[in-house]
């Protein structure tokens, strides 16, 4: 059975467990691996191995996250579970763990709690497309009406935050029961995985999106022209393709006359490849780090956007003091550093280290941006926050 694991023919989806503290997120994660392991689709992970989440650094922010992998009959999943509420906020806002969908765990004994609401809101703001609800601890609730009430509250909460509250699957189960091998509750975990398989959509693959590459470095090859290097973020580039060069004020067009990787010439480069692209008719000083190359007409340069950000605490190496309206740090977008001015939401006087907040940013010059783009906020060479663009305003 163990050989199954390296089979990568199944589509890959990133998911996670979210929800209020002590509602059973980690127990459910352990239960999923345990039940699927019995079917030969996963390696068993104990509660303790998931709960002792290793620290990770993402854009200078320390986050505790556990990564678990398993498969169903149809898909391969990478599953993220975080021990603490602050870890979730950081994880979702900075995109350390991109989620294509999530399982929101709610204890039937408590019903929706403050973090249940907060995680649903965060999922909405960082564009997690769909959620599946797992009502946990149903073995501790005898009253059918109580279960129906909690289910109704969850549907209202989902609808309030623009998820499809009417059709979102809600599974009633017991993570602990499943973990302890009770057949009735094991079946509920399988039912949950079926719901995840069908309700959470397959993410578009980067390779199917239009070509885009942030420029990391530029050099000229005598007699051949200018080469821009970087990692292709999306799409495919062929020799002979026309590209647009965007950012730092003026936009230009060029044709790719060569694609090079590890000093070998290729016919094409695709998402994930680190390549050098030879550009026809472009002078070395016309293109620099921070610009992007993309398929013409796909991306526009913008200077004003709305974003959801997390501001680091002092202990995380962030600011020691709050910042106020019109604060002007650097925004590190892809390979580009650009100064921008922050406008806080109405009624917000200041932002404290450790807060997460929705801000409006105006950059001093237009940069190629898109919704969902993640960035770091820096000041004096250190990261003070991170976030992602939720709306373009110009």
Curated annotation (Swiss-Prot):
Question: Could you tell me which PROSITE patterns the record lists for this protein?
Answer: G_TR_1 (PS00301), G_TR_2 (PS51722)
Region annotation (G2) ranges: 60-64
Q: What is its EC number?
A: 3.6.5.3
GO molecular-function annotation terms? GTP binding; GTPase activity; translation elongation factor activity
> What keywords tag this UniProt record?
Cytoplasm, Elongation factor, GTP-binding, Hydrolase, Magnesium, Metal-binding, Nucleotide-binding, Protein biosynthesis
Positions bound to GTP: 19-26, 81-85, 136-139
Q: Where is this region: G4?
A: 136-139
Q: Where is this region: G5?
A: 174-176
The entry's localization annotation reads:
Cytoplasm
Region named G3: 81-84
Which N-terminal stretch is annotated as signal sequence? none
Q: Does the keyword Flavoprotein apply?
A: no
**Record-annotated tr-type G domain positions:** 10-205
Residue numbers binding Mg(2+): 26
Please name one Pfam family that this protein belongs to.
Answer: GTP_EFTU
Task: State the protein's purpose.
Answer: GTP hydrolase that promotes the GTP-dependent binding of aminoacyl-tRNA to the A-site of ribosomes during protein biosynthesis.
Task: Share what the entry says about its subunit structure, partners included.
Answer: Monomer.
Stored PANTHER family: ELONGATION FACTOR TU, MITOCHONDRIAL (PTHR43721:SF22), ELONGATION FACTOR TU-RELATED (PTHR43721)
Q: Which family does it belong to?
A: Belongs to the TRAFAC class translation factor GTPase superfamily. Classic translation factor GTPase family. EF-Tu/EF-1A subfamily.
Protein name (database record): Elongation factor Tu
Q: Which species is the source of this protein?
A: Phocaeicola vulgatus (strain ATCC 8482 / DSM 1447 / JCM 5826 / CCUG 4940 / NBRC 14291 / NCTC 11154) (Bacteroides vulgatus)
């Amino acid at each position: 059975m163990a050989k199954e694991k390296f089979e990568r023919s199944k589509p890959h989806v990133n998911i996670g467990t979210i929800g209020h503290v002590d509602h059973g997120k980690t127990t459910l994660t352990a239960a999923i691996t345990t039940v699927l392991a019995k079917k030969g689709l996963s390696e068993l992970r104990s509660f303790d191995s998931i709960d002792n989440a290793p620290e990770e650094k993402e854009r200078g922010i320390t986050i505790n996250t556990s990564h678990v992998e398993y498969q169903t009959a149809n898909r391969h999943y990478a599953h993220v579970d975080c021990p603490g509420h602050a870890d979730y906020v950081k994880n979702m806002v900075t995109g350390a763990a991109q989620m294509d969908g999530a399982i929101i765990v709610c204890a039937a004994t408590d019903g929706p709690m403050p973090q249940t609401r907060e995680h649903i809101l965060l999922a909405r703001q960082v564009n997690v497309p769909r959620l599946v609800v797992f009502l946990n601890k149903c073995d501790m609730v005898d009253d059918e009406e109580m279960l129906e009430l909690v289910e109704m509250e969850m549907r209202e909460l989902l609808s309030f935050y623009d998820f499809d509250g009417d059709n979102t699957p809600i599974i009633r189960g017991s993570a602990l029961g499943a973990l302890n091998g009770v057949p009735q509750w094991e079946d509920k975990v399988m039912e949950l995985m079926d719901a995840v398989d069908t309700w959470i959509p397959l993410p578009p693959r980067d390779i199917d999106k239009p070509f885009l590459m942030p420029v990391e470095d530029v050099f000229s090859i005598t007699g051949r022209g200018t080469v821009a290097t970087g990692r292709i973020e999306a799409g495919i580039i062929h020799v002979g393709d026309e590209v647009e060069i965007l950012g730092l004020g003026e936009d230009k067009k060029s044709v790719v006359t060569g694609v090079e990787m590890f000093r070998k010439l290729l016919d094409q480069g695709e998402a994930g490849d680190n390549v050098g692209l030879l550009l026809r008719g472009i002078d070395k000083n016309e293109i620099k780090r921070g610009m992007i190359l993309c398929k013409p007409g796909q991306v526009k340069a913008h200077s004003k956007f709305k974003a959801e950000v997390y501001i680091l605490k002092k202990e995380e190496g962030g600011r020691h003091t709050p910042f106020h309206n019109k604060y002007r740090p650097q925004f590190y977008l892809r390979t580009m550093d650009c100064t921008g001015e922050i406008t806080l939401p109405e009624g917000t006087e200041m932002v404290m280290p450790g807060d997460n907040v929705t801000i409006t940013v105006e950059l001093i010059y237009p940069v190629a941006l898109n919704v969902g783009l993640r960035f770091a906020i820096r000041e004096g060479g250190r990261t003070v926050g991170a976030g992602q663009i939720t709306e373009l305003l110009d």
